[in-house]
């Protein structure tokens, strides 16, 4: 259980810039390492941000992990090219930096550690000795910035092809395809790429066999239907038993974070929909909230409730697809067709409200694109009358089936310790008995005003428990939607603020200054104050977050997107070793991921 304590962001105005020197962890660090050992940075992230010396990094991380109420999860780890950043007053000199975002479940508190690096000495020690899930994050940090990770067990490219040259998130790396030479796939290059994709067990510390027999190495994917996207897993098999495996990702990588550096704060919104392409408005929520923290915008109550309503509609939509395809992976075909009928009703409702279906790009900085249309309440009421009975039928016909239970109970099971070590969030974490839902413990967009429960498992997260928790989450989302229907506030659908983008249309027809602002914001883009902000949300597949750095420009200096699926796929080998190939298929179906969410 976590303490019922909201984070500092909820207690203060969303845009307040704070150093959080009053956070107990700052005192604990200073008592242990001295009052002058760190530089504490004031930000709008809502969490303490502490710059530590590279030589102290592992010691500080170990100290935080062993506190009485420890920081048990490495939530995120990545880097930043600081060379062109102009607003750095009071910060340590740095050409590059690496940040480590840790979470304490018992405290319901976070801390971010930062390490400053010079261009001629780009190296940090590996964090995998403390948190095993640092592995993939460090590989991506090296790949994107060229920062060497000393002691890393397998420092290779993870998102880009192994033949790729350069480090894409450096500021001197081109952001547009037109800045590259035209791509030509010659026969020699094609042969080289195929050769690079050939799996060599020795590169991963695997043996090709024992003294008596050879292991089989099997490619599952990257276009296998049970891989749920362009995803490849190389399996080391002894018969049908999985001895070990290597997940291979990156086939869906689109450079979403690099795009954030060349799109305006406003024009980046459509890209957020496509990070996790089933989540729709759920993906827009953390980005828009993070930008509003930078801008200092507090939105009207009506906007909060509308955003919650759209988010919960997309949560139900995503969960229905997840549950039905899981049932299909186990072997039952009918439910997936019924689920698409239900999802069609949601899309009709979403389209009536936003004008679009899967990717509405409907949230705005300071509000939403337009007000709710006439008749939205009737459509929502009809859906709320329809859906509960359908859920009952899914549960009775398929999810309580003894064959499905036999295939999924006890499969790919792990406990709370393993979940925290691998950065698992969402239903996978809650199935272990840890009651941690961001909507409850760190409420945003007015979730604290809604009455709903957080489904929690009994201590072990297996395939069946994860699915059944999602079913109950569906019921809770229906409760939230009913409250949106019954208690939709009156009022404007945009905040009265200079950085609301676009500004309210009626004012542009009366005030020349507002018309000029409208023109500049939709063409050039709004200028956000130079600061850092952070927002996490309970997305459809776990915790999704945006960590934004503004240098006082119309575009983000650094857009860091942390997605739950990236962490969940890294956990696969530890959860599936010793199981059968057929168990892996069930496990993959129970994770709830799409590759766009993994690869960004």
From Swiss-Prot:
Disulfide bonds: none annotated. Residues 214-600 are annotated as: NADH dehydrogenase I subunit D. One of its GO terms (molecular function) is NADH dehydrogenase (ubiquinone) activity. The keyword Transmembrane helix does not apply. It catalyses: a quinone + NADH + 5 H(+)(in) = a quinol + NAD(+) + 4 H(+)(out). Residues 1-190 are annotated as: NADH dehydrogenase I subunit C. Its EC number is 7.1.1.-. GO terms for cellular component: NADH dehydrogenase complex; plasma membrane. The keyword Cytoplasm does not apply. PANTHER family: NADH-QUINONE OXIDOREDUCTASE SUBUNIT C_D, NADH-UBIQUINONE OXIDOREDUCTASE 49 KDA SUBUNIT. This is NADH-quinone oxidoreductase subunit C/D. The gene is nuoC.
């Amino acid at each position: 259980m976590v303490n019922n304590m909201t984070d500092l962001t909820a207690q203060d105005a969303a845009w307040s810039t704070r150093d959080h020197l009053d956070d107990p962890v700052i005192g604990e660090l200073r008592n242990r390492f001295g009052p002058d050992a760190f530089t504490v940075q004031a930000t709008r992230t809502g969490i303490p941000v502490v710059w530590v010396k590279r030589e102290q990094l592992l010691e500080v991380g170990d100290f935080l992990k062993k506190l009485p109420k420890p920081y048990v999860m490495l939530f995120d780890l990545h880097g930043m090219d600081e060379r062109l950043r102009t607003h750095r007053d009071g910060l340590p000199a740095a050409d590059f930096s690496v940040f480590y975002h840790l979470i304490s479940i018992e405290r319901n508190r976070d801390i971010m550690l930062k390490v400053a690096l010079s261009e001629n000495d780009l190296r940090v020690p590996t964090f995998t000795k403390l948190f095993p899930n640092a592995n993939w994050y460090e590989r991506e940090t090296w790949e994107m910035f060229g920062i060497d990770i000393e002691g890393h067990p397998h420092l290779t490219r993870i998102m880009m092809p192994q033949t790729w040259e350069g480090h894409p998130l450096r500021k001197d790396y081109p952001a547009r395809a037109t800045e590259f030479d035209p791509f030509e796939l010659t026969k020699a290059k094609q042969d080289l790429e195929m050769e690079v994709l050939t799996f060599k067990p020795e590169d991963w510390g695997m043996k090709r066999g024992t003294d008596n027999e050879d292991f089989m190495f099997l490619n599952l994917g990257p276009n296998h239907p049970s891989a749920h996207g362009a995803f490849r897993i190389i399996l080391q098999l002894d018969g049908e038993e999985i001895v070990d495996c290597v997940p291979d990702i990156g086939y869906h990588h689109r450079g979403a974070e690099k795009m954030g550096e060349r799109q305006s704060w406003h024009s980046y919104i459509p890209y957020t929909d496509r990070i996790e392409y089933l989540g729709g408005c759920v993906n827009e929520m953390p980005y828009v909230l993070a930008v509003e923290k930078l801008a200092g915008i507090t939105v009207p109550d009506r906007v909060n409730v509308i955003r919650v309503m759209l988010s919960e509609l997309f949560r139900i939509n995503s969960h229905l697809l997840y549950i039905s395809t899981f049932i299909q992976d186990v072997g039952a075909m009918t439910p997936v067709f019924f689920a698409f009928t239900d999802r069609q009703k949601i899309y009709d409702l979403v389209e009536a409200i936003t004008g679009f279906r899967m990717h509405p790009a409907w949230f705005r900085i300071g509000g939403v694109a337009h007000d709710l249309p006439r008749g939205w309440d009737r459509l929502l009421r009809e859906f709320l009358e329809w859906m509960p009975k359908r859920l009952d039928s899914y549960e009775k016909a398929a999810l309580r089936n003894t064959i499905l239970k036999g295939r999924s109970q006890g499969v790919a099971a792990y406990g709370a310790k393993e979940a925290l070590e691998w950065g698992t969030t969402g239903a996978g974490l809650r199935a272990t008995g840890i009651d941690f839902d961001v909507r409850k413990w760190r409420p945003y967009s007015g979730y604290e005003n809604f009455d709903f429960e957080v489904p929690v498992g009994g201590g072990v997260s297996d395939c069946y428990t994860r699915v059944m928790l999602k079913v109950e989450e569906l019921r809770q989302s229906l409760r939230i939607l009913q409250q949106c229907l019954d208690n939709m506030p009156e009022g404007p659908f945009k905040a009265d603020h200079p950085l609301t983008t676009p500004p309210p249309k009626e004012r542009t027809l009366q005030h020349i200054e507002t018309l000029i602002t409208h023109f500049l914001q939709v063409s050039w883009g709004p200028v956000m104050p130079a600061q850092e902000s952070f927002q996490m949300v309970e997305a459809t597949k776990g915790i999704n977050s945006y960590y934004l750095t503004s240098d006082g420009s119309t575009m983000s200096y650094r857009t860091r997107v942390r997605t739950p699926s990236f962490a969940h796929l890294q956990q696969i080998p530890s959860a599936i070793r010793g199981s059968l190939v057929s168990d892996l298929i069930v496990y993959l179906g129970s994770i709830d991921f799409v590759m766009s969410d993994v690869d960004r």
